[in-house]
Design a protein with these regions (language model features):
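A short glycine/serine-rich beta->alpha loop
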Residues: 19-26, 72-77, 111-117, 187-196
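Condensing-enzyme catalytic core mediating Claisen C-C bond formation in acyl metabolism
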Residues: 67-131, 136-139, 172-184, 211, ...
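Active-site-proximal alpha-helical scaffold in enzymes
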Residues: 24-52, 90, 194-207
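Acidic, glycine-rich active-site loops and adjacent beta-strand->loop/helix elements
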Residues: 28-29, 53-59, 105
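Conserved beta-ketoacyl condensing-enzyme motif
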Residues: 7-26, 143-158
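Internal helical hairpin/lid segments
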Residues: 147-203
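A glycine- and small-aliphatic-rich helix-loop capping segment at beta-alpha/alpha-beta transitions
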Residues: 9-19, 41-43, 64-73, 164-169
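Single conserved hydrophobic/aromatic residue that forms the stacking wall/gate
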Residues: 1-7, 11, 204-215
Length: 216
């Protein structure tokens, strides 16, 4: 994540406008964390907040796994860091879509020790956050046209569905994951799917039907 923060700092530094800057260190959750903090700022005193992040495959391999030159084998449970970037502007004024609720997640550690199976490690926290959101809002999964997680990947997605079902919530029909959607499993060998700060951002166009009123 350090290379992403350094790149963001250099981008902001070289602008003529000297705008305030927060460097958010959140790994796969960076964009959503930025949106949560940005929406709180807009609700309070900010007029416009730009939320942006990025990730890069080779940088992530070097930083968190092994340099590509080593030629290490990747287990089937591993995921492929997305080389991608994107941004969203939150504003006090506009026609939407709106951020109406935010539910920050808690640390949920189920004791997963395999560093190559991040989907299994992250799925319990996603499930806890989702159910907390349902309880806080009084809503059920059927209220939403789409429930989309950031980068649990193929393995994490199935675990999340099973965990929700074990607690009485059926999310199978309207739930998907950006790590599953970003790559074509049949033609691209990315094992358990995509991951990284740029994973969900690269699929931000999913929100376009919301703006057009196609989904609510």
């Amino acid at each position: 994540i350090m290379p992403s923060l350094v790149g963001s700092e250099m981008c902001i530094r070289d602008r003529e406008e000297n705008i305030p800057f927060f460097g958010v260190f959140g790994a796969c959750s960076t964009f959503v964390e930025s949106m949560i903090l940005g929406s709180i700022a807009v609700e309070g005193f900010a007029n416009n907040v730009l939320c942006a992040t990025s990730s890069h495959f080779c940088s992530a391999e070097k930083q968190f796994r092994f340099p590509l030159e080593l030629g290490n084998q990747r287990p089937p449970s591993s995921q492929w860091t997305v080389t991608g970037s994107g941004a969203a502007i939150l504003s006090k004024n506009g026609t939407g879509p709106y951020i109406t609720h935010v539910t920050p997640g808690k640390i949920v550690d189920m004791g997963i020790k395999d560093a190559n199976n991040m989907g299994a490690a992250m799925a319990p926290a996603f499930n806890d956050t989702l159910i907390t959101h349902f309880l806080d809002t009084g809503r059920s999964p059927s209220y939403y046209d789409a429930i989309i997680s950031g980068d649990l990947g193929h393995i994490g997605k199935e675990i999340a569905i099973d965990l929700a079902k074990s607690q009485g919530y059926n999310i199978k029909s309207n739930y998907n994951d950006c790590g599953v959607l970003i790559f074509d499993k049949n033609s691209q060998d990315t094992h358990s799917g995509g991951s990284g700060c740029g994973c969900c951002l690269s699929l931000i166009h999913i929100s376009e039907p919301t703006r057009l009123g196609m989904i609510s």
